[in-house]
């Protein structure tokens, strides 16, 4: 059983760098997901439970299941109030999966009370057969705060003494666009490498926090291996840096003006 959470805050507030005041929050929607999976020879069935632990209702809630190129959508829930719960079961074909571990994605699209769209995302693994644990890992996920664009830097390590050809994918909700597709990397024995992705803010609002997921996949002896890592994208306002810069400029000008007045005063005393 796996779960995921995404939070979105809405509100108006005054941001004062010099005084340290933070933005006021008028309401929040926090989507939590729990999944139960069943994999057969032909299909993957996912039972999804969605709850809202925020204090604002989510509207037009639509769950989506994706496995490789397959997609299924659950029935829409018109409104998910605070403390509310919805449950859906979705099925996608899985007869093209060989032995090993494979990533699947569950997304929940919804709107706030102003009909602004958001999406929550969770990624997990399903297992076919009895594969050994994967011999790769994402040891670090480094994400700079997202304004208009940002970088996601992943440390990927080979945990075996053989060269490894792997595919690295970054999964993000629709609010955030990942530039480019999966990165193909070749890892030397026991080596660690950095894989970077650029992300772009499409519809994410300032103050939102979004989980994103990195998947490292490779083939070994006819078995498909996949490992996952998670990071958090924090959406910042580009304007938040302007008051800080202005504060420093104004402060420097004031100090210069005071220093000039002091010099003039000393000069007058010396003349007198």
Predicted regions and their residues:
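Solvent-exposed, conformationally flexible loop/turn segments
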Residues: 39-43, 82-86, 100, 146-149, ...
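Short, solvent-exposed loop/turn segments at the edges of extracellular beta-sandwich modules
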Residues: 111-115, 219-222
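Membrane-proximal extracellular "stem/stalk" segments
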Residues: 124-241
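Short glycine/proline/serine/threonine-rich loop/turn segments at secondary-structure transition edges
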Residues: 96-105, 116, 203-211
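Acidic, serine/threonine- and proline-rich intrinsically disordered appendage/tail regions
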Residues: 141-148, 230-272
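Intrinsically disordered, low-complexity Pro/Gly/Ser/Thr-rich segments with frequent PxxP/GP/PP motifs
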Residues: 68-96, 176-201
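Sec/Tat signal peptide C-region and signal peptidase I cleavage site
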Residues: 22-26
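Bacterial N-terminal signal peptides that target proteins for export
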Residues: 1-11
């Amino acid at each position: 059983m796996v779960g995921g959470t995404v939070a979105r805050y809405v509100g108006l507030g005054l941001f004062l760098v010099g005084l340290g005041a933070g933005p006021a929050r008028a309401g929040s929607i926090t989507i939590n997901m729990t999944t139960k999976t069943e994999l057969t020879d032909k299909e993957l069935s996912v039972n999804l439970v969605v709850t809202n632990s925020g204090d604002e209702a989510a509207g037009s809630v639509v769950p989506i299941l994706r496995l490789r190129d397959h997609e299924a959508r659950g029935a829409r829930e018109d409104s998910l109030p605070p403390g509310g719960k919805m449950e859906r079961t979705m099925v996608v074909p899985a007869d093209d999966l060989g032995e090993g571990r494979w990533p699947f994605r569950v997304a929940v699209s919804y709107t706030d009370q102003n009909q602004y769209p958001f999406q929550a995302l969770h990624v997990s693994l399903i297992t076919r057969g009895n594969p050994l644990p994967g011999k790769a890992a994402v040891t670090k996920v480094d994400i700079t705060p997202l304004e208009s664009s940002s970088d996601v830097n992943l440390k990927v390590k080979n945990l075996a003494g053989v060269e490894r050809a792997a595919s690295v994918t970054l999964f993000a909700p629709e609010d955030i666009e990942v530039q480019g597709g999966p990165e193909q990397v070749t890892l030397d024995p026991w080596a660690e490498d950095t894989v970077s992705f650029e992300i772009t803010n499409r519809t994410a609002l300032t103050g939102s926090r979004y989980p994103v997921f990195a998947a490292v996949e490779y083939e070994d002896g006819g078995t498909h291996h996949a490992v996952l890592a998670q990071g958090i994208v924090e959406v910042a306002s580009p304007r938040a840096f302007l008051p800080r810069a202005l504060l420093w400029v104004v402060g420097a000008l004031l100090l210069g003006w005071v220093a000039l007045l002091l010099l003039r005063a000393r000069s007058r005393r010396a003349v007198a």
